[in-house]
């Protein structure tokens, strides 16, 4: 029943929180505990040959009459074994080509925190509604073998939206998205008597070899985007169409004392 309710709330799957008045607005809440284990080498080398995930998540919706509010929280502890070719960033698959790699298989200990909320007004004049969505993601990741890394990744995203109800069958919406991206990556060696080899990747198969305890990297980025929605609904039929466009730019600097752009 819970999954069916969430599936039928079409606007909750869109990028516009202002569509909440058009969905089923009955209150609900749930808590989920999870455990996942993956073992084997049929994977990308950065993913590790063994992965265990323990997590807890919760979400809920409440109708406050003067506002509709939804919120969710997720925490996951992710342990990787025998992961390679990454020595600097929490997620080597997020589209950032400039990071540090090494050839030593290592364990990783990662923690993920996700906070989300949506809030919307009831319809003004039986036509207009305003909404706001917010997402905050924090990731702590630590490589367990020299050259080690302690990296902190953060994302804060806000998405205001507006909807217009023409009649019972036709609704229109528009939303704008802004995200701020930040990652602080600091490499080091526990065994200071043995220098380690590492490679500074520049993308397109280009890399520079380094020897020592690694580098400190500072990643800063922004994302802008927007989306348009159209909803056609009847008692026995409900259709939501959405088109979106995002632009993301991210830079990386090595060292805080003498910053060097990559």
PLM region descriptions:
Residues 1-83:
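N-terminal, post-signal peptide beta-strand-biased segments of exported outer-membrane/organellar beta-barrel
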Residues 50-56, 109-115, 152-156, 220-226, ...:
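Residues that define the transmembrane beta-barrel architecture of outer-membrane proteins
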Residues 56-62, 115-121, 158-164, 226-232, ...:
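Residues on the lipid-exposed face of transmembrane beta-strands in outer-membrane beta-barrel proteins
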Residues 38-53, 104-108, 140-153, 215-219:
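Outer-membrane beta-barrel proteins
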Residues 25-29, 65-71, 126-130, 168-172, ...:
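Outer-envelope beta-barrel architecture signal
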Residues 212-262:
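Long, internal scaffold/assembly segments composed of regular secondary structure
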Residues 41-46, 82-88, 141-149, 185-191, ...:
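Outer-membrane beta-barrel translocator domains and adjoining extracellular loop/strand segments
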Residues 29-37, 71-79, 132-138, 174-180, ...:
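Transmembrane beta-barrel strands of outer-membrane/channel proteins
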């Amino acid at each position: 029943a819970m999954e069916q309710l969430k599936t039928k709330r079409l606007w909750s799957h869109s990028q516009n929180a202002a569509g909440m008045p058009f969905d089923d607005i009955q209150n609900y809440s749930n808590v989920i505990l999870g455990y996942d284990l993956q073992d084997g080498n049929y994977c990308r080398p950065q993913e590790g040959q063994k992965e265990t995930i323990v997590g807890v998540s919760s979400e809920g919706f409440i109708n406050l009459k003067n506002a509709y509010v939804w919120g969710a929280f997720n925490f996951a502890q992710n342990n990787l074994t025998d992961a390679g070719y990454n020595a600097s960033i929490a997620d080597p698959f997020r589209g950032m080509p400039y990071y540090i790699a090494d050839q030593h298989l290592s364990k990783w200990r990662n923690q993920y925190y996700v906070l989300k909320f949506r809030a919307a007004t009831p319809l003004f004049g039986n036509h207009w509604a305003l909404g706001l969505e917010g997402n905050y993601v924090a990731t702590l990741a630590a490589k367990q073998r020299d050259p080690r890394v302690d990296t902190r990744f953060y994302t804060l995203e806000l998405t205001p939206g507006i909807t217009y109800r023409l009649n019972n069958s036709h609704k229109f919406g528009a939303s704008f998205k802004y995200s701020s991206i930040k990652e602080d990556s600091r490499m080091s060696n526990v065994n200071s008597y043995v220098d380690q080899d590492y490679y500074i990747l520049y993308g397109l198969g280009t890399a520079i070899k380094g020897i020592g305890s690694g580098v400190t990297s500072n990643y800063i980025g922004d994302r802008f985007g927007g989306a348009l929605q159209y909803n056609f609904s009847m008692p026995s039929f409900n259709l939501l169409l959405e088109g979106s466009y995002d632009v993301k730019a991210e830079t990386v600097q090595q060292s805080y004392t003498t910053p060097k752009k990559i």
